[in-house]
Amino acid sequence: MSKEDMIELEGVVIEMLPESRFRVRLDNNMEILAYGSGKMKMHRIRVLLGDRVTVEMSPYDLTKGRINFRHPTANPGAGPRPSHHHRR
């Protein structure tokens, strides 16, 4: 399936599940099960409860999706999130 066939929607993470999965409520009030994309894992982009995300879904299964983008937080003074990877 090509990228043009995918449906892209926005939503909010409402629940964090085991194995890097998330329950996301889309803007149309549908709830889906989503996982982080490989690029997000590779660059250690953390997705937390309440984050606004962009989800890519297949038209054949509208209950599952892949999180492609985590939108910046609305609080500009919050600063970057702490990393758990510290060098000694």
UniProtKB/Swiss-Prot annotation:
One MF annotation (Gene Ontology) recorded for this entry: translation initiation factor activity
GO CC annotation, single: cytosol
Entry keyword annotation includes Protein biosynthesis: yes
Pfam families in alphabetical order: eIF-1a
Alphabetically ordered keywords of this record: Cytoplasm, Initiation factor, Protein biosynthesis, RNA-binding, rRNA-binding
Chief localization: cytoplasm
Region annotation (Disordered) ranges: 66-88
Cellular location(s): Cytoplasm
Source species, domain of life: Bacteria
Domain S1-like: 1-72
Reported function: One of the essential components for the initiation of protein synthesis. Stabilizes the binding of IF-2 and IF-3 on the 30S subunit to which N-formylmethionyl-tRNA(fMet) subsequently binds. Helps modulate mRNA selection, yielding the 30S pre-initiation complex (PIC). Upon addition of the 50S ribosomal subunit IF-1, IF-2 and IF-3 are released leaving the mature 70S translation initiation complex.
NCBIfam families xrefs: infA (TIGR00008)
Subunit and interaction comment: Component of the 30S ribosomal translation pre-initiation complex which assembles on the 30S ribosome in the order IF-2 and IF-3, IF-1 and N-formylmethionyl-tRNA(fMet); mRNA recruitment can occur at any time during PIC assembly.
Membership in a protein family: Belongs to the IF-1 family.
Protein's UniProt name: Translation initiation factor IF-1 1
Source organism of this protein record: Chromobacterium violaceum (strain ATCC 12472 / DSM 30191 / JCM 1249 / CCUG 213 / NBRC 12614 / NCIMB 9131 / NCTC 9757 / MK)
